[in-house]
């Protein structure tokens, strides 16, 4: 049986759950990562303190792949600068390009994201661009050298779930790269539904960081993502447009 792995930039991951780290108490990160079974975690450089204070890198378990993001970047130039800084800090070649200059809704700037992706891909980064679900933009990101496509489900931190569901389905059908749902997933059930649709992975942060029991919620997401993936690979049962179909014979049971 073929091994089911997520492949990004030539690297293989058995976990399809990418954990965000932006809102955690540092002391809970290790437990969340372990319960999530996550092999990749996002990293905002402002939390990687190299001047002697608390450093998030000290709390991330060994062997977990770092995914530095360009949080705070307002244009391609700033995103490229942050990515280069992350590499200089030995955070590796993965980078999540996140470019936002809309401070109210925190929606990504797709066009600046394309520009940054092209520059960074040429420099050997494994670029994972965060974007608004748009097929034409996704195609441009593929051509720019992206390693995957990361459409938002709903606005960052909203926990509103799969508001862009129909557009994500289009990306799954039309784009050959892994589609990783990012931002807005608020419940394990929503993560499961995304995986059932055929996305390659799910990233979650706020839904876990704001839960009553953070490690337990991380574990719940892990199970939901695994269940959704298994359902997708199994082939979901058909849905009738109308009427019903008995699951047991309606004749030949009670006879005179």
Curated annotation (Swiss-Prot):
Oligomer and partners: Homotetramer. Forms heterodimers with either ThiH or ThiS.
Catalyzed reaction equations: [ThiS sulfur-carrier protein]-C-terminal-Gly-aminoethanethioate + 2-iminoacetate + 1-deoxy-D-xylulose 5-phosphate = [ThiS sulfur-carrier protein]-C-terminal Gly-Gly + 2-[(2R,5Z)-2-carboxy-4-methylthiazol-5(2H)-ylidene]ethyl phosphate + 2 H2O + H(+)
Enzyme class: transferase
InterPro entries for the chain: Aldolase_TIM (IPR013785), Thiazole_synthase_ThiG (IPR033983), ThiG (IPR008867)
Gene3D superfamilies, per the entry: Aldolase class I
Location of this chain's protein in the cell: Cytoplasm
Family the entry assigns: Belongs to the ThiG family.
Residues where 1-deoxy-D-xylulose 5-phosphate binds: 157, 183-184, 205-206
GO cellular component, one term: cytoplasm
Active-site residues, record numbering mapped to chain: 96 (schiff-base intermediate with dxp)
Pfam family, one: ThiG
Protein name, per record: Thiazole synthase
GO molecular function list: thiazole synthase activity
Chief subcellular location: cytoplasm
Enzyme Commission number: 2.8.1.10
Role of this protein: Catalyzes the rearrangement of 1-deoxy-D-xylulose 5-phosphate (DXP) to produce the thiazole phosphate moiety of thiamine. Sulfur is provided by the thiocarboxylate moiety of the carrier protein ThiS. In vitro, sulfur can be provided by H(2)S.
Gene designation per UniProt: thiG
Pathway involvement of the protein, from the record: Cofactor biosynthesis; thiamine diphosphate biosynthesis
Any one biological process term the GO annotation gives: thiamine diphosphate biosynthetic process
Domain of life: Bacteria
Keywords assigned: Cytoplasm, Schiff base, Thiamine biosynthesis, Transferase
